[in-house]
């Protein structure tokens, strides 16, 4: 196997049809720190831990808006408590908090339908 030239993941991007609404959701509702805001480029970035989350208004950039099926798992200390707080802010979850045997998860979407997950791993990595 060849040595990987991939050094890491620089950012994860989600598409929006309304940049200001997405900024309110990721910044105000989820409490992520906004690090970049370029309204003239229809673009914003948020920071959490070692991840940069980019939010782009794809259609205004000449790209197709698409919602992907892969969840972005957001690490929290207590999934149930974080879910309760977000529900109080109007976020709707799909199903109950579930236990996989190694972690707790709760699924929801952003206002554009991008799938997100509250996640807490309690079992050690093998």
Where are these regions (language model features)?
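Vicinal oxygen chelate
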Residues: 1-5, 83, 87-126
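N-terminal beta-strand motif that seeds the catalytic metal site of vicinal oxygen chelate
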Residues: 1-21, 70-74, 122-126
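Residue-level marker for the onset of beta-strands and adjacent loop->beta junctions
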Residues: 10, 40-42, 70, 82, ...
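Amphipathic alpha-helical segments
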Residues: 20-34
């Amino acid at each position: 196997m060849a040595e990987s030239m991939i050094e890491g993941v620089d950012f994860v991007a989600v598409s929006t049809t309304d940049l200001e609404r997405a900024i309110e959701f990721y910044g105000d509702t989820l409490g992520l720190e906004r690090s970049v805001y370029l309204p003239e480029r229809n673009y914003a970035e948020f920071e959490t831990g070692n991840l940069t989350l980019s939010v782009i208004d794809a259609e205004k950039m000449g790209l197709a808006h698409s919602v992907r099926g892969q969840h972005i798992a957001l690490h929290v200390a207590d999934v149930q408590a974080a879910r309760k707080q977000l529900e109080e802010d109007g976020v709707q979850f799909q199903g109950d908090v579930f236990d996989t045997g190694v972690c707790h998860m709760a699924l929801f979407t952003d206002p554009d339908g991008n799938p997100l997950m509250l996640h807490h791993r309690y079992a050690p990595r093998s």
